[in-house]
Design a protein with these regions (language model features):
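A residue-level marker of the well-folded mature domains of exported/periplasmic proteins
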Residues: 1-185
Length: 185
């Protein structure tokens, strides 16, 4: 990605405005998203923008949609979202975009109603690497389990899809013991 033309100073002072930016996570109160909250807070401190993070207390697509509805009603400038279910958030994110709210998504490569989609890495390549390490550790033989945070988690399912495809090609002596399991995020 060529970022040479990307704006470097994104502070409220440089923009001449303080933007309100909400991050909506899959579920509040778990370590992964607690760490994300630290980054959201740091971004606010670094730039002067009004930023915060919210999420449902349990992994619940309807509760996440309601949080986004509330943010639309508040008139935020941007919503950053890690969807629990891409299908569930599509309509409400379209509504946000129709109202001029910028939508930025993470862990949702197939989301249609986003202005930007950011992922940390290539999901298939990540799955390939997971299986490469597992396959070598198992000597290329035996049964294994595949788990995801939730069965609706797009990125994690892409990891597992990549891993299974890699296993079939490189470790035919291995088999998936059961369908992938969801851990409830």
């Amino acid at each position: 990605v060529d970022v040479s033309q990307a704006r470097k100073d994104i502070s409220a002072d440089a923009a001449g405005k303080t933007f309100s930016i909400a991050t909506v996570v899959k579920v509040d109160g778990i370590a992964w998203f607690d760490r994300m909250r630290d980054g959201v807070k740091q971004f606010g401190e670094d730039t002067g923008h009004d930023v915060w993070q919210v999420g449902p207390s349990q992994a619940d697509a309807a509760a996440q949609v309601q949080l986004i509805e509330n943010l639309i009603a508040q008139g935020v400038d941007a919503i950053c979202v890690v969807p629990f279910s891409v299908d569930a958030v599509e309509p409400v994110l379209q509504k946000a975009r129709d109202r001029g709210i910028v939508v930025i998504a993470h862990e949702a490569s197939n989301l249609k109603n986003a202005d930007y989609i950011l992922d940390a890495f290539d999901n298939k390549a990540y799955g390939d690497k997971l299986m490469e390490v597992l396959g070598k550790s198992m000597g290329g033989k035996g049964k294994y389990l595949a788990t995801v945070g939730s069965l609706t988690s797009q990125s994690q399912n892409e990891w597992i899809d990549g891993a299974i495809a890699y296993q079939k090609e490189h470790f035919p002596g291995m088999t998936l013991a059961t369908e992938r399991l969801g851990g409830g995020e």
